[in-house]
């Protein structure tokens, strides 16, 4: 599996002053659920942006991505439509180039990414905050089995996957094993650069 981030060309220096909030974590941790709740909580905050990822997989109720075919995705790369793109789990993922304008305007941009692209994003953006959302292994396994998404592949393999990269260390970790509302409030506090514990 190849998970190498490729950044848009032509950017000089780290992009800022806004914050890039990277939400990472294992499959089944509840990242999409917490992101949806956080987005709803920030709906009237124009300084917080939740861009839709571009993915070569159909969108679903749990993951509101922009679906593209592999050919369309390749054309997007060729046209410079993405701020960053990577491949993981048999799919291609990208963040739209417009996030750079939001960050230059001082907004917080909140995105779900692979842990393997954190190092490249920390270099490209001036103010990066990594939020790891996780859950106990038995909870992860239950959630993956319950969603029964074909593209999840081998559940045991997904659960055993790790990233050995110091730059992938989280700045904040949320153990999402209780109330999704409670944990989404923690995430909102991080997004707004407030204390994240209650």
From Swiss-Prot:
* Cellular component terms (Gene Ontology): cytosol
Q: State the UniProt keywords alphabetically.
A: ATP-binding, Nucleotide-binding, Transferase
Which residues of this UniProt protein bind ATP? 25-32
What's its job? Catalyzes the phosphorylation of ribose 1,5-bisphosphate to 5-phospho-D-ribosyl alpha-1-diphosphate (PRPP).
* InterPro entries cross-referenced by the UniProt entry: GK/Ca_channel_bsu, Guanylate_kin-like_dom, P-loop_NTPase, PhnN
The cross-references to PANTHER family, in alphabetical order and at most eight, read: GUANYLATE KINASE-RELATED (PTHR23117), RIBOSE 1,5-BISPHOSPHATE PHOSPHOKINASE PHNN (PTHR23117:SF8)
Give the domain of life. Answer: Bacteria
- What's its catalytic activity? alpha-D-ribose 1,5-bisphosphate + ATP = 5-phospho-alpha-D-ribose 1-diphosphate + ADP
Give the protein's recorded name. Ribose 1,5-bisphosphate phosphokinase PhnN
A single MF term (Gene Ontology) = ribose 1,5-bisphosphate phosphokinase activity
Native species:
Bradyrhizobium diazoefficiens (strain JCM 10833 / BCRC 13528 / IAM 13628 / NBRC 14792 / USDA 110)
Tell me the GO BP annotations in alphabetical order.
5-phosphoribose 1-diphosphate biosynthetic process; organic phosphonate metabolic process
Q: What is its EC number?
A: 2.7.4.23
* Pathway participation: Metabolic intermediate biosynthesis; 5-phospho-alpha-D-ribose 1-diphosphate biosynthesis; 5-phospho-alpha-D-ribose 1-diphosphate from D-ribose 5-phosphate (route II): step 3/3
Which family would the database say this protein is a member of?
Belongs to the ribose 1,5-bisphosphokinase family.
Instruction: Give me the gene this protein comes from.
Output: phnN
């Amino acid at each position: 599996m190849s998970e190498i981030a490729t950044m848009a060309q032509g950017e000089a220096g780290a992009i800022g002053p806004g914050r890039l909030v990277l939400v990472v974590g294992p499959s089944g941790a509840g990242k999409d659920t917490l992101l949806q709740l956080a987005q709803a909580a920030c709906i009237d905050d124009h300084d917080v942006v939740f861009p839709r990822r571009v993915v070569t997989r159909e969108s679903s109720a749990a993951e509101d991505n922009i679906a593209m075919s592999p050919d369309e995705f390749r054309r997007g790369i060729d046209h410079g439509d993405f701020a960053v793109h990577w491949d993981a789990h048999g799919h291609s993922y990208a963040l739209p180039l417009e996030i750079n304008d939001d960050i230059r305007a001082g907004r917080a941009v909140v995105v779900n990414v692979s842990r393997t692209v954190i190092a490249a994003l920390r270099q490209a953006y001036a103010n990066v905050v990594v939020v790891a959302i996780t859950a106990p292994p038995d909870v992860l396994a239950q959630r993956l089995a319950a969603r029964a998404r074909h593209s999840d592949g081998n559940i045991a393999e997904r659960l055993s996957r790790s990233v050995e990269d110091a730059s992938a260390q989280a700045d904040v970790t949320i153990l999402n094993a209780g109330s999704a509302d409670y944990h989404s409030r923690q995430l909102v506090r991080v997004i707004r650069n407030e204390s994240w514990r209650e």
